[in-house]
Amino acid sequence: MISKDHLHHLDPLGTTKSYHMNTSTVSPPSPASSISLSQSAWLEVRLFYVRIAPCVVENVPDFLTLRHPRRETGASLEVNGVRVPSSQTASLKLRRDRVDRESSEVTYVSTETVRVTGCVDFEVYDNEDMVLCGNLDRIEGAWNNGTVSDPKTGWGMDCYIAMGNGHVSGPSASVFFQPKFGVSSPSVEVYIAGCCGGVPVILTKTIQASPRRKVARHVTLDAIPEDEEVGKEQDIGTIGDELARQSKVQMMESEVDEYDDSDMKMAQRYYPEGMYVDEDGQLSWFNAGVRVGVGIGLGMCLGVGIGVGLLMRSYQATTSNLRRRFL
């Protein structure tokens, strides 16, 4: 046992302070409170439901695949009580539950128990074609930007229509997005039911697939030469050629309606005068007639001019002869 004098000898200025904790006043957390705190952070999903309408019910698959891709640090995932490492992808089956031929809709359901914490993404596939994607996350009410959330627990869901093979762009080969079957913009409803800390949680969202929009078309016309100096007959021929020439219009479009696969098309347009152009590009009989008519007109003008000149010359000669006689 150390005496007070010995302590004073070790610290004569009395700078050493001793702290005493009354352990009788601090009680350890009860097991029930620790369990409730840990369970309140988990969202337990007991039902995952997807409804798609309209669709071609004769071609819909028997199963869809629900995937939870790799997650970031801090996000946990359990499937039927088994922890899934964050570096691995979990896959579940969505079985076809109901098909309504009158309303052309189909429903897929999964009743596997899935528990998540943090932000966990999910993806729904038809074979290798993504149908939709989204995420589950616990968010604050102030940051709710279009996300469906539960006001009591704070858990929210956001989802989007996926139009391509594992991507959110490009045409999809899924049977749910096939314009040739008359289905290009179906409505997809996602429904999740579960609980968080003993509080029931229901999240549902309906998303509508819309046809892709066209972008502005860039039109380029061929330049018309203006600085060439030619003769009168060549000018007349050039005018006729310019009236009959065709204009190539290049349409640059990155997206087309009904998920068309082509991104660039070349089309040829004609001026109204182009109807007088044959398939081989030569002048038609109409333009040839115009040329002949212009030539005839010029010939007539030249003939009249020559005739008037000869008449004037003969008149002058006659006048001079008469003057000589009278003089």
UniProtKB/Swiss-Prot annotation:
It comes from the Eukaryota. The keyword Transmembrane helix applies. The chain crosses the membrane at residues 183-203, 292-312. It is found in: Membrane. Disulfide bonds: none annotated. This is Uncharacterized protein At1g01500. Its main location: membrane. Residues 12-31 are annotated as: Disordered. Keywords: Membrane, Transmembrane, Transmembrane helix. GO terms for cellular component: membrane. It is a multi-pass membrane protein.
